[in-house]
Amino acid sequence: MTFIYHIATVADWERAVRDGQYTMSTRGLTLAEQGFIHASTAEQVPLVAETFYRGAPDLLLLVIDTDRVGPEIRYEQVPGQAAPYPHIYGPLNVTAVVEARPFRAPDP
């Protein structure tokens, strides 16, 4: 069992639970706009939080079981980063999320 992670707003996650699928790519961008959902390994979460979510309120860290994800997951290189990041190429089925933990972003 392998886990990947995604930082989500509480509002976006609540909408996903109602709809049965999560369709936000990253903060302020939808899956339709970006083409995939950004995810991270456990080691990558702090850098993502620091870079994109600094000071953001009402966040959750979604713990995603890769064995349960319906769409394709591709590990892709990001310029300037040593390790590739997992990208989910389609709506994330909420049944793949095994935990939605309260998450505090770094202060601004």
Residue ranges, per PLM feature:
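Conserved, structured core segments of small domains
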Residues: 1-108
